[in-house]
């Protein structure tokens, strides 16, 4: 089995359905004997360019190990899901398990937000 990194972008109006979508894709992978090494929900982010007149979308990254039939099934699911705006599947040499640079950025932004709200709460 080969290692893959999958990033898919979901319509921002469908953000509440992302956990269910991730579970569906996880069950597809594991039911065919594949493994999931990392799943990262990057949240709503600014798009580099407008897609379907949208400036923001919900990003999800998955690092998996699966066979070609499972990958074909996942790609088919992405293509025929109207909520998925774009998807990218990249073959990797080895399994990635640590946090991605994008996830580190998300965590840094969350830390800044929580640090900014704590002083205002202390004054109140």
UniProtKB/Swiss-Prot annotation:
CDD domains in the cross-refs: bS6
Positions with biased composition (Polar residues): 115-124
UniProt keyword annotation of Transcription present: no
Disulfide bridge map: none
Keywords: Ribonucleoprotein, Ribosomal protein, RNA-binding, rRNA-binding
Region (Disordered): 96-124
Pfam families reported in the protein's UniProt record: Ribosomal_S6
Cellular-component GO terms for this entry: cytosolic small ribosomal subunit
Record flagged with keyword Ribonucleoprotein: yes
Gene Ontology terms describing biological process: translation
GO MF assignments: small ribosomal subunit rRNA binding; structural constituent of ribosome
InterPro entries with a match to the protein in the record: Ribosomal_bS6 (IPR000529), Ribosomal_bS6_sf (IPR035980), Ribosomal_S6_plastid/chlpt (IPR020814), Transl_elong_EF1B/ribsomal_bS6 (IPR014717)
Task of the protein: Binds together with bS18 to 16S ribosomal RNA.
Family: Belongs to the bacterial ribosomal protein bS6 family.
Name listed for the protein in its UniProt record: Small ribosomal subunit protein bS6
Gene source species: Paraburkholderia xenovorans (strain LB400)
